[in-house]
Curated annotation (Swiss-Prot):
It comes from Arabidopsis thaliana (Mouse-ear cress). CDD domains: F-box_AtFBL13-like (cd22160). It comes from the Eukaryota. Keywords: Leucine-rich repeat, Repeat. LRR repeats lie at residues 116-144, 161-192, 199-230, 235-261, 277-308. This is F-box/LRR-repeat protein At3g58900. Residues 1-47 form the F-box domain. Coiled coil: none annotated.
Amino acid sequence: MDLFSSLPNELLYHILSFLSTKEAALTSVLSKRWRNLFAFVPYLEFDDSVFLHPEERKREKEGILQSFMDFVDRVLDLHGDSLIKTFSLKCKTGVDSDHVDRWICNVLARGVSDLDLFIDFRDLYSLPHEVGVSRTLVVLRVGSESDLYWWQKFLCLPMLKTLVLDSCWLCIGQFQILLLACPALEELDMTNTRWKDSNVTVSSSILKELTIDLHGCCSVVNLKSLSFDAPSLVYFYYCDSLAEDYPQVNLKNLVEAQINLLLTQAQIEQVRALNNEMLVADDVFPGLGNAWKLITGLRNVQQLYLSPDTLEVSFLSLVYFWLVGRI
């Protein structure tokens, strides 16, 4: 008898959890005992790029996408009604959206707590309603290389602590709805998120980590105002176009902040044009002088990183920077 065969099932489940679902499924050929053992692992990971071997142009072969969908269906069927803790799905155009919806609803019905979705379809894809009303989700990651839409009028995610959004639409009024719908949210990461609101407020008494990274993203609108009322925040990464105003910046417990205010070349030239004594900031670029409101709102931070553009727009006449103080 080999060493692995003598181990209890619970330990084998744990070992298999370190493999991708495809790799775990390959163990079923080892023996009768292993045949369906992988089906009881509560951690499922499906990545069509791994399954389809894009380097071999396998995706273009007839029937290969169907075989991927059949594989996911078969694994979920083998799991029956058993608990699924983590479900990761990464798929691109060609995989049927009805299948994707069915898979997501399947794992939500079985109490999944960690849901990681990267869905890259050519057409705008909307996640099923069940994602926004899950009472078991603790971690939710939603991403795409294009644009993804999953918002709805009613959201309720009472257990959610970590939310990561990549290339998602935030329609008018939905950001505030989102924060209210996630009363336990401690970490929010927004990358390439498109604002539709012109006035946004990040308000949360328990949020601890906030990342706003819109580098390379063309928002639908330029923000007229962006406020932060997050007294429990300890980490803040902000990379976005300069808002016209920062009326409130309440981040009194901040430990680390990284600020990169993005300016177009035209805006940079306009900033430099302010050396003309006949001009003031708002004559050139509305709200340019309000960047200082954001910087002064970070006065309690322990570690502060400012990009060159941020320094330039915050200190309009700065030609020399010398820091004196006790570190």
